[in-house]
Amino acid sequence: MYAVIKTGGKQYKVAEGEFLKVEKLVGEVGDSVEFGEVLMIGGEKIVVGAPHVAGATVTAKIAVQGKDKKILVFKSKRRKGTRKLRGHRQHKTVLKIEKISA
């Protein structure tokens, strides 16, 4: 059984027991998170919401609160010798999907 959920402005296809890296969520490691914005549930029978599946929830547990890989942003002006190098690490949360209920 799988589901499509919406969190952090993005949509993710999830299944029970798998890990998912999403934008930072509020909570400590070990806390339980419930997603009510379930867009679709698949398995033997596919249920598509309009826009959400009524009564469906996905429960997950926070496994890791951390940062993503560093990306480098380099800006320069041609012929001027002006250069700027910045680094950025986005905050991420790793979830373990516990249960999909419809």
UniProtKB/Swiss-Prot annotation:
GO cellular component entries: cytoplasm; ribonucleoprotein complex; ribosome
Keyword Lipoprotein: no
Molecular function as annotated in GO: rRNA binding; structural constituent of ribosome
Example GO BP: translation
Superkingdom of the source species: Bacteria
Entry keyword set: Ribonucleoprotein, Ribosomal protein, RNA-binding, rRNA-binding
Pfam families cross-referenced by the UniProt entry: Ribosomal_L21p
Ranges in coiled-coil conformation: none
Quaternary state and interactors: Part of the 50S ribosomal subunit. Contacts protein L20.
Family affiliation: Belongs to the bacterial ribosomal protein bL21 family.
Alphabetized PANTHER family for the sequence: 50S RIBOSOMAL PROTEIN L21, LARGE RIBOSOMAL SUBUNIT PROTEIN BL21M
Biological function: This protein binds to 23S rRNA in the presence of protein L20.
UniProt name for this protein: Large ribosomal subunit protein bL21
Species whose genome carries this gene: Pelobacter propionicus (strain DSM 2379 / NBRC 103807 / OttBd1)
Lineage of the species this protein comes from: Bacteria, Pseudomonadati, Thermodesulfobacteriota, Desulfuromonadia, Desulfuromonadales
